[in-house]
């Protein structure tokens, strides 16, 4: 009777094999693949279990499901490990993959392990090197200078996460902003398409689509030509508020705007060269103080007899629009703060109906135009159109659309990544590596103790012959951003070692169900959408969108604990201290994180309770897209449910797999109605990914089954209910379900059995409750047969309401089918 979960789970896992012929697949289920950090955590458990439930359910519906797994295996932690533990990143990564593979299998996930891939394998990244060469041909890849975080001690570029309080994570040196040549992909070529096609993603969360919409950031405005005094040049300025032009008091340009080459004052030139690039404002919500340098350049206002000074500022960037804006302090808060700081004019041109105080903040609402010459008296919308027309008429301005999104910088000065297949030759310039020489692989004999990029420091690897002229040349020593690998892996699963299979991709993509965290909304998910379009343009397949349905699971949270000194404690440490009577501060539930120590070891949970218990808890109570709080009582409750379920079914000795439910007593029919109603509900819940609701329903079914057994309901009806229960719990708690199926004599593996279909006849309600009303006021509820005719229903309602009607005249009787009867009366005068 005892449920030995360890024995059951180990036994069942040996029997599973979820191989799928990808060319025959009908449904593609994919979770965001993990970085092989070494251990699976609770967030992984939730992510992968949600996907596994969907995959198992779809298989049970007779659908050929493709459910692969792989490893996002390049990345900075492997280099950090190489430095800390004196181990090769390849070895560190492989060991972690081996460990995490065992952990994933222990959870009981129905993956097709035959399609397993790792992005650090040359057989994988040789294809993306080929993509890059094709992107070059199609004009989707290019090289230019861009700002990077530069560590002057280690002589290397740092990722943003490696800059801690403005200093390099390893050297402690103050990080500088430098311009270096970097490779870029032209995601901006698809900006309009990426934005517009969000409308067709009707199975994506609205929040994710809104985040992408804002990230792409379409801005419709006007480019205005300002004449620069004394140097016979014009400065193009972009604005989305042309109606405020009469309120302009200065021009703001990026620190690297080409017009600054016209500055002649040596002191100002020195100030510009010393410009603090570390405090650039790249986000409108930034709290970084706004500052500027008067360049000495002056432009002429196009409509007023006044000149505007040109400031070099930290809140305008060259890679957005024209790199120049005009400042209207009265109607833009950023400009207002800048004008206050530098004592610039603040001129109001938009006036609301109520007087406002411009002494504290800018006014950004609607109103009537004043102090604006030919715009006076107009509304804001009218003034915008009138100003655009005037600028066009004078030939000094025109409509323009820009996007906030920038081209994707893919160069990383790191070792553990995919080498960029480029060679630099003094004679031939930039030369792509020949396709026959792909893949360009990483050297294994690298030294991580030296500062700088290990590839750049390697004594031999970067020195090659030019493929064009045969002269001495050097390899590109940068590697791809790791988002490059994760932007196409969903297509790699559809291919072979020979590359992407065009026909299979066209058939199977987009992925039907994609599950992962919302934190990837504007990087991985957007880059993947771009990659589909880029690969389509290059002829690899014809797929616009990578993911049809997106499920963003919530975080797994846990209370935080700290001692009297504020030091964080692990949950087990906190428990022990509380048992000893020591004071422990209990904080609110937050996302599990190593830094706050509010983590629960998944291996410990599986060892103590089993995978099915962990799966059941993580799927219970909370919708998949909401955060879930880890509670010890919850995991204990899930464990007790499984033990009770096991005992109930194993102890029933009248099971009959050839049950006959035709001629059964009325009390048994009542139970069948309940069972089939729950089957219908669970099926609906699974179709709409209401997994927590489905769990609640099958637990309800367990209670009904327990009552049926206790009251000795017809054994055939009980047998049917047992078979149904075992089948519907399988996607959620597959080990115990599979073993129970085996114990009752089920043939073949349970996951191969079809999903139970609810008997529609049993779903028809025999009786319905009808609200009886008089003049719209509720009187009583009438319970009648579901198929009662209207005349009979009318008669019964009138009889029930006769005391209320009294001597009044019945004017009409309205029947709302299966819901209400409203008797309209008129009292006698």
UniProtKB/Swiss-Prot annotation:
Q: Which keywords belong to this entry?
A: Aminoacyl-tRNA synthetase, ATP-binding, Cytoplasm, Ligase, Nucleotide-binding, Protein biosynthesis
The answer to whether the entry has keyword Ligase is yes
Q: Tell me, which GO biological process terms does this entry list? A: leucyl-tRNA aminoacylation
HAMAP family tied to this protein = Leu_tRNA_synth_B
Pfam families recorded: Anticodon_1, tRNA-synt_1, tRNA-synt_1_2, tRNA-synt_1g
Q: Give the Enzyme Commission number.
A: 6.1.1.4
Superkingdom is Bacteria
Reactions it catalyzes: tRNA(Leu) + L-leucine + ATP = L-leucyl-tRNA(Leu) + AMP + diphosphate
Q: For the motif 'KMSKS' region, what are the positions?
A: 591-595
State what protein this is by name.
Leucine--tRNA ligase
User: Which residues are noted in the entry as ATP-binding?
Assistant: 594
Motif interval(s): 'HIGH' region: 34-44
Q: Provide the protein's localization.
A: Cytoplasm
Taken from the UniProt entry, a GO cellular component term is: cytosol
Entry-linked CDD domains = Anticodon_Ia_Leu_BEm (cd07958), LeuRS_core (cd00812)
Question: Which InterPro entries does UniProt cross-reference here?
Answer: aa-tRNA-synth_I_CS (IPR001412), aa-tRNA-synth_Ia (IPR002300), Leu-tRNA-ligase (IPR002302), Leu_tRNA-synth_edit (IPR025709), M/V/L/I-tRNA-synth_anticd-bd (IPR013155), Methionyl/Leucyl_tRNA_Synth (IPR015413), Rossmann-like_a/b/a_fold (IPR014729), tRNAsynth_Ia_anticodon-bd (IPR009080)
MF annotations from Gene Ontology: aminoacyl-tRNA deacylase activity; ATP binding; leucine-tRNA ligase activity
Please name the gene that encodes this protein.
Answer: leuS
Main location class: cytoplasm
Ranked from the top, the taxonomy reads:
Bacteria, Pseudomonadati, Pseudomonadota, Alphaproteobacteria, Rickettsiales
Protein family according to the UniProt entry: Belongs to the class-I aminoacyl-tRNA synthetase family.
Origin organism of this chain? Ehrlichia canis (strain Jake)
């Amino acid at each position: 009777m005892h449920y030995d979960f360890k024995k059951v789970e180990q036994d069942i896992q040996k029997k599973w094999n979820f191989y799928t012929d990808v060319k025959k697949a009908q449904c593609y289920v994919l979770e965001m693949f993990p970085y092989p950090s070494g251990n699976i955590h609770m967030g992984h458990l939730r992510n992968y279990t949600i996907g596994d439930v969907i995959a198992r359910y779809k298989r049970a519906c007779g659908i050929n499901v493709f459910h692969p797994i792989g490893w996002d295996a390049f990345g900075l932690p492997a280099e950090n490990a190489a430095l800390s533990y004196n181990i090769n990143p390849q070895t560190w990564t492989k060991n972690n993959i081996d460990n995490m593979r065992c952990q994933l299998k222990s959870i009981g996930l129905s993956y097709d392990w035959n399609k397993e891939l790792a992005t650090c394998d040359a057989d994988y990244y040789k294809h993306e090197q080929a993509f890059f060469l094709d992107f070059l041909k199609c004009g989707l890849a290019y090289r230019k200078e861009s700002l990077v975080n530069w560590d002057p001690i280690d002589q290397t570029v740092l990722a943003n996460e490696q800059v801690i309080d403005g200093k390099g994570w390893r050297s402690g040196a103050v990080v500088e902003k430098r311009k270096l040549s970097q490779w870029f992909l032209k995601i901006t070529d698809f900006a309009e398409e990426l934005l517009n096609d969000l409308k067709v993603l009707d199975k994506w969360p609205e929040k994710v689509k809104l985040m992408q919409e804002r990230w792409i950031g379409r801005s419709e405005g006007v480019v205005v030509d300002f004449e620069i005094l004394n140097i016979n040049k014009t400065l193009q300025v972009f604005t989305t508020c042309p109606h405020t032009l009469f309120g302009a008091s200065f021009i703001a340009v990026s620190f690297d705007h080409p017009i600054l080459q016209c500055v002649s004052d040596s002191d100002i030139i020195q100030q510009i060269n010393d410009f603090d690039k570390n405090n650039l404002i790249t986000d409108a919500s930034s709290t970084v103080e706004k500052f500027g340098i008067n360049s000495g350049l002056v432009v002429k206002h196009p409509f007023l007899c006044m000149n505007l000074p040109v400031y070099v500022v930290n809140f305008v960037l060259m890679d957005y629009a024209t790199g120049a804006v005009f400042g209207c302090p009265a109607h833009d808060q950023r400009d207002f703060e800048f004008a206050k700081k530098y004592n610039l004019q603040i001129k109001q041109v938009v006036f609301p109906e109520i007087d406002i105080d411009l002494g504290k903040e800018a006014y950004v609402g609607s109103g009537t135009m004043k102090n604006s010459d030919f715009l006076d008296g107009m509304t804001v919308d009218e003034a915008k159109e009138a100003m655009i027309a005037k600028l066009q008429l004078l030939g000094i301005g025109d409509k323009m659309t820009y996007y906030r999104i920038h081209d994707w910088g893919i160069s990383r000065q790191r070792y553990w990544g995919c080498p960029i297949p480029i060679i630099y030759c003094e004679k031939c310039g930039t030369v792509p590596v020949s396709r026959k020489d792909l893949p360009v692989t990483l050297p294994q004999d690298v030294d991580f103790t030296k500062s700088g990029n290990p590839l750049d420091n390697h004594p031999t690897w970067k020195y090659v012959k030019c493929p064009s002229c045969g002269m001495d040349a050097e390899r590109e020593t940068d590697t791809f951003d790791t988002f490059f690998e994760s932007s196409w892996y969903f297509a790699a699963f559809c291919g072979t070692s020979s590359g992407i299979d065009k026909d299979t991709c066209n058939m199977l993509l987009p992925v039907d169900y994609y599950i992962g965290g919302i934190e990837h909304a504007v990087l991985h998910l957007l880059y993947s959408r771009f990659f589909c379009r880029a690969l389509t343009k290059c002829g690899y397949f014809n797929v616009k969108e990578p993911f049809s349905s997106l499920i963003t699971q919530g975080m797994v949270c846990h209370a935080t604990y700290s001692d009297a000194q504020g030091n964080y404690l692990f949950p087990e440490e906190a428990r022990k201290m509380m048992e000893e009577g020591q004071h422990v501060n209990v904080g609110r539930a937050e996302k599990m994180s190593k830094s706050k120590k509010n983590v629960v070891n998944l291996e410990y949970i599986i060892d103590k309770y089993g995978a099915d218990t962990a799966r059941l808890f993580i799927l219970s109570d909370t919708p998949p897209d909401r955060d879930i709080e880890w509670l010890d009582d919850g995991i204990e409750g899930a464990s007790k449910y499984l033990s009770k379920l096991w005992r109930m079914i194993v102890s029933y000795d009248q099971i009959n797999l050839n049950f006959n439910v035709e001629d059964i007593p009325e009390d048994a029919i009542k139970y069948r109605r309940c069972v089939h109603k729950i089957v219908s509900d669970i099926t609906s819940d699974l179709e709409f990914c209401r997994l927590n609701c489905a769990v609640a329903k099958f637990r309800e079914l367990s209670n009904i089954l327990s009552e049926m057994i206790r009251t000795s309901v017809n054994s055939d009806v009980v047998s049917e209910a047992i078979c149904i229960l075992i089948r519907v719990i399988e996607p959620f708690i597959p080990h115990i379900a599979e073993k129970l199926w085996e114990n009752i004599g089920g043939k073949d593996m349970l996951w191969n059995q079809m999903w139970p279909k609810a008997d529609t006849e049993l779903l028809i309600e025999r009786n319905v409750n009808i609200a009886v009303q008089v003049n719209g006021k509720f009187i009583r509820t009438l319970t009648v047969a579901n198929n009662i005719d209207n005349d009979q229903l009318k008669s019964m309602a009138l009889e029930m309401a006769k005391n209320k009607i009294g001597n009044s005249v019945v004017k009409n009787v309205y029947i709302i089918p299966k819901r209400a009867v409203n008797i309209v009366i008129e009292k006698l005068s």
